[in-house]
Amino acid sequence: MSASDFSSAVVVLAAGAGTRMKSDLQKTLHSIGGRSLISHSLHAAAGLNPEHIVAVIGHGRDQVGPAVAQVAEELDREVLIAIQEEQNGTGHAVQCAMDQLEGFEGTIIVTNGDVPLLTDHTLSALLDAHVEVPTAVTVLTMRLDDPTGYGRIVRNEEGEVTAIVEQKDASAEVQAIDEVNSGVFAFDAAILRSALAELKSDNAQGELYLTDVLGIARGEGHPVRAHTAADARELAGVNDRVQLAEAGAELNRRTVIAAMRGGATIVDPATTWIDVEVSIGRDVIIHPGTQLKGETVIGDRVEVGPDTTLTNMTIGDGASVIRTHGFDSTIGENATVGPFTYIRPGTTLGPEGKLGGFVETKKATIGRGSKVPHLTYVGDATIGEESNIGASSVFVNYDGENKHHTTIGSHVRTGSDTMFIAPVTVGDGAYSGAGTVIKDDVPPGALAVSGGRQRNIEGWVQKKRPGTAAAQAAEAAQNVHNQEG
């Protein structure tokens, strides 16, 4: 029988202060790979499809509670909350959780909110090992080349766990053991409930230790076994910023490898960062210095980078995005973006469209084949199909109090340095001359021009700026002109 044939519940411990993070943000809310630490733990728990998930929170619960609720919404399932008013040890934390599991009979897995690399696959293997042979407690263990600081797993000849011995209490013989406690357990619910009632705080810390449940269970004749994780790196806890960075790097390494095995070419994995929710198609090329964040979706045959950051972006098949920062927007199939393009939320670039160098967009819809080649701001605007916006154009959308919309039709050609003073509409097929300030609607097919003939005021610089370098240069040039004349 497998774990899926048995009822299970998962308890996630996340009540600690995490003082070593030296942060106003509660420890489990720090993020790697686009998710908070506790979000990673809750996703792993949900992967078991347990009957119940309980998050035990305490320190910083005003921050952690809403975060847990948000993850529950993402998972589309209930996550129960247990409050540990005083952080009185791991045993006390699980006692608090049991109030939410009244009447539950089955297997309870206890894990932590600061082990972001732990997968549902490993938790499922622990659950399978626990139910395969009836056991009171199954400890998830790991083997380390350097086990210093960890509680050693002592087994008898039958392979049962007889003790978890902390480093400070271990003899030389025990210190030589490389199998250590991960802090993740599977318990028989009834035995756990009974043993928790017997916990005592007669130890150096004056706390209730969850590990004492193992001794109580063995004292009552119940078997305690261990299951060794296939990859010890999954069980690395995060207690400070160094460990946060290390866990983030390892998670990213795994994510990048998965993308490459899925058909993407990543030129330099060391400088490419991909969040866990990102989706990447086949035959994608990702150049160095690229960050793909949030729920970004990359289609097939897309080229991204170098030096590009995309957050919650959707990139259509065959598109190219170079040296661009983009947020919460959509790029159509076979479109080209960059270099040095800033795409702000609410932008949609149609298929075969173009956003060129030093272009900024916000709340802009740009139709199929339309181009904004360079040095332009497009905000609060709609541009039809196959239109071209000249260089250095500005969509002037703010009057000091309110934002206004500009509508550009299809097959429009605007000259360089055109200003669109919103609200304004430019009809299909219209043109504008260079330097035009468009304040009124332009009919379809019309040419818009503004400003009178150029007037040159001779001698203005020498009169108004006498003695300046400009005046001296002008006078010298005029003298040469007069001599040649």
Swiss-Prot record:
Disulfide bonds: none annotated. Acetyl-CoA binds at residues 391, 397-398, 416, 434. Residues 263-485 are annotated as: N-acetyltransferase. Pathway: Nucleotide-sugar biosynthesis; UDP-N-acetyl-alpha-D-glucosamine biosynthesis; N-acetyl-alpha-D-glucosamine 1-phosphate from alpha-D-glucosamine 6-phosphate (route II): step 2/2; Nucleotide-sugar biosynthesis; UDP-N-acetyl-alpha-D-glucosamine biosynthesis; UDP-N-acetyl-alpha-D-glucosamine from N-acetyl-alpha-D-glucosamine 1-phosphate: step 1/1; Bacterial outer membrane biogenesis; LPS lipid A biosynthesis. Residues 1-241 are annotated as: Pyrophosphorylase. Its EC number is 2.7.7.23, 2.3.1.157. UDP-N-acetyl-alpha-D-glucosamine binds at residues 13-16, 27, 84, 89-90, 151, 166, 181, 239, 344, 362, 377, 388. GO terms for cellular component: cytoplasm; membrane. Residues 469-478 have a biased composition (Low complexity). InterPro entries: Bifunctional_GlmU, GlmU-like, GlmU_C_LbH, Hexapep, NTP_transferase_dom, Nucleotide-diphossugar_trans, Trimer_LpxA-like_sf. The active site is at residue 374. Residues 465-485 are annotated as: Disordered. Mg(2+) binds at residues 114, 239. Binds 1 Mg(2+) ion per subunit. Residues 242-262 are annotated as: Linker. It is an enzyme of class 2 (transferase). One of its GO terms (molecular function) is glucosamine-1-phosphate N-acetyltransferase activity. Its cofactor is Mg(2+). It is found in: Cytoplasm. In the N-terminal section; belongs to the N-acetylglucosamine-1-phosphate uridyltransferase family. Catalyzes the last two sequential reactions in the de novo biosynthetic pathway for UDP-N-acetylglucosamine (UDP-GlcNAc). The C-terminal domain catalyzes the transfer of acetyl group from acetyl coenzyme A to glucosamine-1-phosphate (GlcN-1-P) to produce N-acetylglucosamine-1-phosphate (GlcNAc-1-P), which is converted into UDP-GlcNAc by the transfer of uridine 5-monophosphate (from uridine 5-triphosphate), a reaction catalyzed by the N-terminal domain. This is Bifunctional protein GlmU.
